[in-house]
Every structure is written in C-alpha cells, then in structure tokens.
UniProtKB/Swiss-Prot annotation:
Keyword annotations: Oxidoreductase, Pyridoxal phosphate
Official protein name in the record: Probable glycine dehydrogenase (decarboxylating) subunit 2
Cellular component annotations (GO), alphabetically ordered: cytosol; glycine cleavage complex
Keyword Oxidoreductase: yes
Functional summary from the UniProt entry: The glycine cleavage system catalyzes the degradation of glycine. The P protein binds the alpha-amino group of glycine through its pyridoxal phosphate cofactor; CO(2) is released and the remaining methylamine moiety is then transferred to the lipoamide cofactor of the H protein.
Catalytic activity: N(6)-[(R)-lipoyl]-L-lysyl-[glycine-cleavage complex H protein] + glycine + H(+) = N(6)-[(R)-S(8)-aminomethyldihydrolipoyl]-L-lysyl-[glycine-cleavage complex H protein] + CO2
Gene (name only): gcvPB
Keyword Chaperone: no
Quaternary data: The glycine cleavage system is composed of four proteins: P, T, L and H. In this organism, the P 'protein' is a heterodimer of two subunits.
GO biological process, one term: glycine decarboxylation via glycine cleavage system
EC number(s) stated in the UniProt entry for this protein: 1.4.4.2
Classification via SUPFAM superfamilies: PLP-dependent transferases
GO MF term list: glycine binding; glycine dehydrogenase (decarboxylating) activity; pyridoxal phosphate binding
Top EC class, one word: oxidoreductase
Length: 473
C-alpha cells in the first residue's frame, strides 16, 4: 500500500493548534525586507493526522535500533539511550550567551578534547567540524596553510591517496585545490611501498591514509610509510573512519601521523544517518597547531574561555562551536566506558568481524584479501551472484545489507562491519541468511525485496532526474 506524503494529507484550513496573536504584531518588529511576500506553502493537517503520519513513517524505517546493520566503514554500533538524557541537560544553552555563564559546557568541550588527544596522540584539537568529510577538508586546509606559511604552497600541489581510500579523500583534496594521485594496493591489500616511493617528492603536500584500511587490514608498514613521508616533507593525514578497531590500543600520533580527523558519530556513539548531525574533530601535531580553526576552548586562571587570538588560523569552518550535543554524547560515551572499556569495545569489534568472516567463508563467500581482519572485511559472492541482488535479498530477510561495490578494487564487494555491540547469535543468524540467499532461485534474487514498503527503485532515473520538491515549479 502506498504511503501518502504529508502534503497529500493536507486540507485547506485544518489546524493542529491555534497561535495566540502577538502584541505588538510580530511583523511590526521585523524589517519589511525580511518579511515574506506570500505565506509559506506548509501542509495543513490536524494533530492526529500529523502524529499518525510520522509514527507510520517511523515504523517503515530500518535502523540499528530495529535490526542488524553491518554497513561497512560506517560503524553502525548501538547508541546508548543514556546519552540522550545527557544531551537534554544542555537543551537551554544558547551559543550567543556569555561564555562565563556556560562554564559547564566549555568544560565538557575542553575535557572531550583532552580525551581525544590522549586517544589519538595529537597535541591540539578543534571540535568545530560538523562531519567526517568536513573534518577532512579542515585537516587538508590546515596542511595547505602550513605549506604556504613555509613558502612551499606553490610547489606542493599534489595529495596522494590509496586506491582503496574513501571517495571523500580525493574529493576533499580536489576541493582544497590539490591534484590527486592514486597509490595502488599491493597483493596483500596494503599500500604498495615501491609505488609510494616513486610518487613522493617536493611536489607532494600530503598522503591520506585510513588505518586499518577499507579492506579491514592494518597497514603493517605504517612506520616505514611515515618515515618516507617525513624525509620528503610530506604531511601524513589520518582518516579516522576506522578508529573503532584500534581505540585504546594504538594511536595515530605514535604511528607518525600529523593530522587526524575523527568521526564521533561512528566511533563514539553519536547517532548518525539521514544527514546528521555529525561531528568530525581534527587533531594535529604541535607544528600544525597554529593553523587550527578559531575559536579553541582553553582553560585559564579564571575558568574556560574561547580563544580567538590565533593569527595563523585558517579561520572559522562552522558557525558557533561545532555540533555541541554530538560532543555531549561522545563525552558521555568516553566517561561511561573509560580507557579499559574503550579497549574492550575495540577488541570485541575485531573479534566479531573475524568470527563473521569465517562464518561467511563457510557459507561459500570469498574474501579476496584474507589477512588478519580488524573491525571489518570485504567479501565476494560466488561466481554468478551480484552484490546488489544479495543486498536486496537481505532486506527481504529482515537484515540491513552491508556496503556494496566498495572499495572499488574488489569486484562485487560486500563490505561488512558488525561492530562490537552485536551478540554472537545475531552474527550467526546473519550468516545463515547470507547462506540462504545463495540457495534462492536467480529470479527470486533479481526481483527482491518483496515485502518492504518500497521495492526496487529506478536508481539511474533518481540520479539523473531527481525530483527534490513536492511542487512542480
């Protein structure tokens, strides 16, 4: 049965509440140039219709609270509801209020920064970026400012990325004005060291790496990679997408990374999906600290304050001070678990991934880069099966599918990340479902799913001819 849009439920004149007339009228207080000439085209519905509409939509959603969600490279772990209670405690704060009246909030931000520096081995940090890709761009702009300050901005115009990198890495470098060159992976799925040596030189600004990489493998030669970058004057950038595998056990700063961005909405249990809000703090080594965005939260003799006096800063990268309530949730997560708890979470994430990998291999799936997996792995179906069909079939069986067709270096890739919060029984049930799909008739797979609210979309048409508004014009 089709589900009507909220605009299709609208009936002229229906209201869910009656607004009290303002005295004086609001329009008398607002400059005329800021007033609408015509009323906004909002749906007109009563309260019950509104409640039923959004309750109905919520029952059609799939999320980590409803089913197993092994979306590779996304760390869809459970988000404790206690953190929502903590976030509500700060609901009445306003970013324009005097910092002297928001000492608790500033203290939380400062403490979170200290925790993240300790976990990553960085010397300074900004909490301002609002997402992972936003953090990436901030980090690369910091590197650009550093090279420009040294008089090398015009010569170092290249950023290196592995062929297994997240797509946001080359996009970020390009947005920052750099040329992007790809470094191939070796036969074991790690960076090809000889290829890297050929590319390094005085023309290179940075190398962007994820460790563990997107194949779920730890870059075992990371110290050698770091040494080569240092000798060439190249800044080593850490994409924190996969920090969940090593938090508390290993620190990017100790591996030689100069910049790191984190995804609080992945590693530190801030709910994500649907466009945010996210949080992508950026940590740097001391030589890059002068270029961090303003303001930074600092602690002085009279309490905590916002430091804008940073002449070499790249400036603001977001209004106000980041997605603050995301920071509250991450702070609560770290304070709840402590260092030993974080280490256990990382260890369980790795254990779950390795166990599930072996289960899928028993069901007939291949793992082309079958080294010691960390928090995730990339599998392939047997010959003749399409990753897309298997993903759609999983929806019919009640599971969210893994990431498909990424990384690009694996054909028909199924990128699986179970996270630490899933039980052994859940992993086994998922493996059984994956095995059952291989026994389904080809026609069944090609037409799945059957019982979801929306079946197969015309994805090509949706990309080429998107309809982004309900209204025709």
């Amino acid at each position: 049965m089709s589900f009507p849009l909220i605009f299709e439920r609208s009936r002229k004149g229906r209201r869910g509440l009656k607004l009290v007339k303002a005295v004086p009228k609001a329009e008398d207080l607002i400059p005329k140039e800021h007033l609408r000439e015509v009323p906004p085209r909002l749906p007109e519905v009563d309260e019950l219709t509104l409640v039923r509409h959004y309750t109905g939509l919520s029952r059609r959603q799939v999320g980590v609270d409803t089913t197993f969600y092994p979306l590779g490279s996304c760390t869809m772990k459970y988000n404790p509801k206690l953190h929502e209670e903590a976030a509500r405690l700060f609901a009445d704060l306003h970013p324009y209020q005097d910092p002297r009246t928001a000492q608790g909030a500033l203290r939380l931000m400062w403490e979170l920064g200290e925790y993240l520096k300790a976990l990553t081995g960085m010397d300074a940090i900004t909490l301002e970026p609002a997402a992972g890709a936003h953090g990436e761009l901030t980090g690369i702009l910091i590197i650009r400012a550093y090279h420009e300050d040294r008089g090398e901005g015009r010569t170092r115009r290249v950023v290196l990325v592995p062929d297994s990198a997240h797509g946001s890495n080359p996009a970020t470098a390009s947005m920052a004005g750099y040329q992007v060159r790809e470094i191939p992976s070796g036969p074991e799925g790690e960076v090809d060291l000889e290829a890297l040596k050929r590319e390094l030189g005085p023309h290179v600004a940075a190398l962007m790496l994820t460790n563990p990489n997107t194949l779920g493998l730890f870059e075992r030669r990371i110290l050698e990679i770091s040494r080569l970058c240092k000798e060439a004057g190249v800044q080593l950038y850490y994409d924190g997408a996969n920090l969940n595998a090593i938090m508390g056990w290993a620190r990017p700063g100790d591996m030689g990374f100069d910049v790191v961005h984190l995804n609080l909405h992945k590693t530190f249990t801030v709910p994500h999906g649907g466009g945010g809000p996210g949080s992508g703090p950026v940590g740097v080594k001391a030589h890059l600290a002068p270029y961090l965005p303003v303001p930074l939260v600092e602690r002085g003799e009279e309490g905590f304050y916002l430091d804008f006096d940073r002449p070499k800063s790249i400036g603001r990268v977001r209004s106000f001070y980041g997605n603050f309530l995301a920071l509250v949730r991450a702070w609560a997560y770290i304070r709840t678990l402590g260092l030993e708890g974080l280490k256990k979470a990382a260890a369980l994430a790795v254990l779950n991934a390795r166990y599930l990998k072996e289960l899928l291999k028993e069901k007939g799936y291949r793992v082309p880069y079958d080294g010691p997996s960390m928090h995730e792995f990339v599998a392939q179906p047997p010959q003749g099966f399409r990753a897309l069909d298997l993903a759609k079939g999983l929806l019919e069986l009640g599971f969210h599918p893994p990431t498909v067709y990424f990384p690009l270096i694996v054909k028909e890739a199924l990128m699986v990340e179970p996270t630490e919060t899933e039980a052994k029984e859940t992993l086994e049930a998922f493996a059984e479902a994956m095995g059952a799909l291989l026994k389904k008739p080809k026609e069944w797979l090609e037409n799945a799913p059957y019982s979801t609210p929306v079946r197969r979309l015309d994805e090509l048409r949706a990309n080429r001819s998107p309809k982004l508004t309900y209204f025709d014009e």
